[in-house]
Amino acid sequence: MKYLVTGAAGFIGYHTAKRLLENNNEIIGIDNINDFYDINLKNARLKELSKHENFNFYNTDLTNKSDVLNLQNENKIDAVIHLAAYAGVRTSLSDPWAYQENNVTATLNLLELCKISSIKNFTLASTSSVYGDNKTLPTNETIPTSNPLSPYAASKISAELLSYNYHYHYGINTAILRFFTVYGPFGRPDMVIFKFIKLILENKPITIYGDGTSSRDYTYVTDVSDALIASTKLNGYEIFNVGGGSATTLDNLVKIIESLLEKKAIIQNIPRDPSDVEHSLADITKISKILNWQPKYNIEQGVRETGKWFLDNLDFISSINLKD
């Protein structure tokens, strides 16, 4: 099959494209290599993907409609996996316009490409942030998404609604995957597990927002890639949660990393940001039933794999700048 994967130089995009290439699929990778975080990570991922002869890369700005629609000149694309986005709750508060352009306009342009090119399947990467500070745990897909706590979450809700519109009017098979805190090797340096491992290894303080009792459903990246690939076979329209199936407090996460690295963390506590969700836990019943998907990694196993990647790439990781 031939897949268009946006955000191919990104964390999840890299792992998803790699998995597809290893199974002899053809990939059109799209990314604009922006400097949202250290581009050395993005370039290193692209270098790995470019070793595959079935990988073709385009440095394309998805907010530019004409550039996106020019992709219709490609030979028949079977499915689009749309991962390119501006991510991050706190960052979106300082520049909401960038999130509107890169998360909403870009999605609209891709949906239009699907329409005019008769691409049958479209998968949108969304986020558990759309649920706001929901108190119902585990959270299923029927929980209302009308009270987002950040422009990031609001932009993803808008992208979801546009995706439904194009399914409804043009019959595009559409899967929306709401990710719960993804982590793993080659991760994003603005995410907590990457930050904590790097800072603890370097004997630098880590910052914990709140008292350490807030919790997240952490999801290992190859589990996410498996869910994305399975979703491209969907007929119809569905929203799925993609989570690890259990919640881990920040305090416990630090202990897991300390045990792995055999080093103690230097901890600084600061007040919890009001845009942060206090607890998250995915109900993954729906995706298990419809796509026959289950996570393979628990938090201890996933952190161990992530830590191994760090220890195997210390020189490279030491050069990576962390993003606040």
What positions do the PLM features span?
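Residues that form or immediately flank small-molecule/cofactor binding pockets and catalytic motifs
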Residues: 62, 144, 184, 213, ...
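C-terminal substrate-binding subdomain of Rossmann-fold SDR/epimerase-dehydratase oxidoreductases
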Residues: 18-19, 200-324
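Generic secretory/membrane-interface signal
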Residues: 25, 34, 97, 153-154, ...
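Residue-level recognition of oxygen-bearing side chains
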Residues: 67, 98, 105, 144, ...
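Short alpha-helical
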Residues: 63-66, 87, 187, 248-249, ...
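Generic recognition of short, well-ordered alpha-helical segments
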Residues: 15, 40-44, 70, 91-94, ...
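N-terminal Rossmann-like NAD(P)+-binding domain of SDR-like oxidoreductases, especially those catalyzing
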Residues: 1-182, 297, 304-305, 310-313, ...
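NAD(P)-dependent short-chain dehydrogenase/reductase
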Residues: 42, 133-138, 151, 157, ...
